[in-house]
């Protein structure tokens, strides 16, 4: 076990910067696909439910990543004993999660709902793996496993029920928005110690 030192701080700051860049690009892409340069229709209103769903999951992920890195690696009062392998693991998992946001951002159009759902399902699966390993480390993130499982069940169930069928164009977007809105509220309530230490 190593103490927190300048090299660790530099590495965490580098990782957080890389994650921030990818997530900022994803947010920019999502906004660009909602607000277009078309004179006849600058706002793509049919994409609003998917954009809101994107924001509902984007904000808590971005905030929790920042808080987790600070509490786990930068704050000597809350940091567990430092192990380089966990820092590498966290960095890899967070970059993979950020990449999922970029894929989600490109699939806001209602006709691409399966791509959006797929990216959310991959994101939640990655987060379950990360949460399970982090929980075994002794860091309280257990509620996220349950929340991610609920999202997987609802979206996976919707995809399964929709196989071979044509759903009303906006229905999957509304299901997504409501599911992610409710699970985000639950996340903030159940994991408030990480979001607001």
PLM feature spans:
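N-terminal topogenic module of multi-pass integral membrane proteins
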Residues: 1-71
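Membrane-interface helix-boundary signature
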Residues: 5-15, 42-49, 110-116, 138-144, ...
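Helical transmembrane-bundle signal
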Residues: 23-30, 53-64, 94-100, 123-131, ...
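Helix-loop junctions on the outward
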Residues: 36, 61-88, 104-108
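Juxtamembrane membrane-water interface segments of multi-pass membrane proteins
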Residues: 37-38, 67-74, 165-170, 193-196
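Membrane-proximal helix-loop-helix units in multi-pass membrane proteins
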Residues: 84-152
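Interfacial loop-to-transmembrane junctions
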Residues: 160-179
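Juxtamembrane boundary at the C-terminal end of a transmembrane helix
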Residues: 185-197
């Amino acid at each position: 076990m190593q103490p927190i030192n300048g090299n660790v701080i530099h590495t965490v700051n580098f990782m957080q910067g890389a994650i921030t860049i990818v997530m900022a690009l994803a947010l920019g892409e999502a906004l660009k696909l909602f607000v277009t340069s078309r004179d006849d229709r600058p706002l793509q209103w049919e994409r609003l439910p998917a954009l809101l769903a994107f924001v509902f999951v984007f904000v808590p992920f971005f905030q929790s990543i920042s808080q987790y890195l600070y509490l786990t690696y930068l704050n000597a009062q809350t940091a567990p004993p430092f192990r380089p392998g966990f820092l590498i693991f966290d960095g890899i998992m967070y970059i993979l999660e950020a990449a999922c946001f970029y894929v989600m951002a490109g699939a806001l159009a209602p006709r691409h709902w399966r791509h959006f759902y797929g990216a959310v399902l991959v994101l939640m699966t990655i987060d379950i793996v990360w949460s399970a390993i982090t929980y075994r480390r002794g860091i309280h993130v257990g509620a996220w496993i349950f929340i991610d499982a609920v999202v997987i069940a609802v979206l996976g169930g919707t995809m399964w029920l929709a196989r071979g069928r044509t759903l009303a164009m906006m229905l999957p977007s509304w299901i997504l928005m409501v599911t992610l809105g409710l699970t985000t509220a639950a996340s903030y309530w159940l994991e408030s110690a990480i979001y607001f230490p």
